[in-house]
Amino acid sequence: MSRPSHTSWLVVSILALVCVIAFAQTQPPQRSIQPGPDRKPGEGEGPFERLVIRGATMIDGAGAPPMGPVDIVIENNRIKEVRSVGFPKVAIKESGRPAKGVKEIDATGMYVMPGFVDCHAHIGGVAQGTPAEYVYKLWMAHGVTTIRDPGSGNGVDWTLNERERSAKNQIVAPRIFVYVRPGMGWDKGRVTTPELAREYVRWAKQKGADGFKIIGEESLFDPEIMSALLDEAKKLQMGTTTHMSQTGVARTNVIQAARMGMGSMEHWYGLPESLFADRVVQDFPLDYNYNDESHRFGQAGRLWKQAAPPGSKKWNDVMDELIKLNFTIDPTFTIYEASRDLMRAMRAEWHDRYTLPSLWKFYQPSREAHGSYWFYWTTQDEVE
């Protein structure tokens, strides 16, 4: 049998490629995880016309030390009264306690505190194989009662729907604030002009989004486009935050964005760049490639050494200005702890019971899975 010619193989390859492209166009990849299941009987109660939590030790979350016993009165989902009702290890006099509630919880010997608000909380992801139920229950079990999903990676409509289901107590989940990435969800494509930025903000407001996460596309870090988006968001009383990717931070860093009206930042990207005293661009190694996440995260950690040192005039000036601008920093420290001590993070005792197998698989060393850059991670990386 004669050997196929190079031209024949090329034709076959092109036809195969066309078939793959056609299939991809008719079979879009799954982009959303399984939503939270409907609330089942016995999964939570309320809200109640009048709920009284009795005999708890309270941590108020505002810096005060623990205090108790206290009775807490909640009416129609709002705290109406917190009353000190006695002394530790002494019988409580009933005459000094608030009136009975429709529902009462005996919290004797327990602590009560406000729910945690997680401002950087992604509701799972298809690649990680995490259904919403798994994520919600982890949050609720750890006392997280409100989350902000920066980017709404499962889609605008999906995340808005989960927010409404949570608000109606149809699912077991925290309260959800929906922050979308400019350009996602609508039919006009990327945001590449100030006019499109303003139009997208108005579109997102009409959809019901709570705010915006600026990340990724370089056009969004164009000062004119970012300024227009922030201005329109402010007019419509919508929130804003940014993940200052290395791909755009040289055009606009955190202090510059804050001056335009940015409300907060995710992680810490863009902050050391705001503290540069002798450069504009970070000192990248000659072989640096942003798509290699061991480069991306390894050099990001070293970036602080290129910034003005703590306590210096530059450092204090930036800090003081951010405070004056009422700018919020959401540093997400815990995820970066693994970069300082990988083996400790991998062998945490709770993995065996609580880490979903698909999630464990995703975070094995990989050149493709985001945040799994351990394929060449050394002691030098951890120390520096």
Task: Label every PLM stretch briefly.
Residues 11-22:
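Bacterial N-terminal signal peptides
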Residues 34-39, 43-47, 58, 64-113:
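Histidine-rich, glycine-flanked metal-binding segment
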Residues 200-218, 264, 271-384:
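Active-site neighborhoods of metal-dependent hydrolases
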